[in-house]
């Protein structure tokens, strides 16, 4: 086997591989000899089929296998000896298309090599960790929100009209073209006005009603309504108002705390403080992570594989286009050309991605099975009732596993950077932290 370099420009590599016909022939014969004892053929005892007959029967198929194995072996040997790591799957093609048995096999292989990543010393990197304490006002606001979510309704004074946010208890019968329809009637139904739980326009017409009132509510079902026989049609709901109730927030006391699993109000306040500070810490981490990535980007410079940058730029352009055009699904749209800004961002992402991967590999960073399981279960919660199917899908899909593994790996490498860098704490207000987070989104 002969391997000749044909291209070596920057990260681009090209090689001509020649596999001698004699080598292929030897490997085919070896495979036939290995299989011969187990082969049965009409007119011959098991293991006694002559080699020429075996070659005629199976030679062509085995030659295809041998050629593929030889090319794969040549590639693997080349990468082991050269130390090159291809950025993407190498492009391999056979150049003698008129090949026939007895000819050498000529193959061209081209690829872009991953660059050598320089050592990075982050001990001199200065990072600022924003710290926000849970203030009493924030805890009180959270308590008020909990009390509001635990609200109850109590009857308004006799003759009082309903207001937006009130609950009305109604009997109703819905009709289309004068005929009642399935699912269009109920008794003693508690409807919160302003909840938008009914057909658009329904709840607004019940604002101002009183207990004992009878009112016809006329609405039009949306064109995209689930029941096709009702979609786009006008309906009249004859409603009888039985009660009008005003919302009453739960009192902030030990009883409220018990509703949310705490022993008393003090424990609930403590839990809220911990949750708030955990949220603040998560946001502060994102701010410090961006600062760390900015610092790393300034510390290193190396050539990037054009194919990786191009693929990343296209992905960025495609994602941003869909964010601006949320109504368009899939790829049914004109081709999206990346801009200079997309290319610049792609270069940063590829450079940092390669750097973090190298740092993690040298530090022997690993994503544990437990961490992967937690990540999968977190994603599975988005598909209630189908968690098991989602879990099985991930187990059988290596690409999806990598998509879940990558951010975990990256965060563990970032933790290494935090440990080695000079980190100082700065106590700030919740508002200042929010501004810092918003600044990340604007970049």
Swiss-Prot record:
Entry's InterPro entries? PPIase_dom_sf (IPR046357), PPIase_FKBP_dom (IPR001179), Trig_fac (IPR005215), Trigger_fac_C (IPR008880), Trigger_fac_C_sf (IPR037041), Trigger_fac_ribosome-bd_bac (IPR008881), Trigger_fac_ribosome-bd_sf (IPR036611), Trigger_fact/SurA_dom_sf (IPR027304)
Q: Which GO terms describe its biological process?
A: cell division; protein folding; protein transport
Which EC class, in a word? isomerase
* Gene3D superfamilies reported in the protein's UniProt record: 3.10.50.40, Trigger factor ribosome-binding domain, Trigger factor, C-terminal domain
Domain named PPIase FKBP-type is located at: 165-250
**E.C. no:** 5.2.1.8
- Protein purpose: Involved in protein export. Acts as a chaperone by maintaining the newly synthesized protein in an open conformation. Functions as a peptidyl-prolyl cis-trans isomerase.
Official protein name in the record: Trigger factor
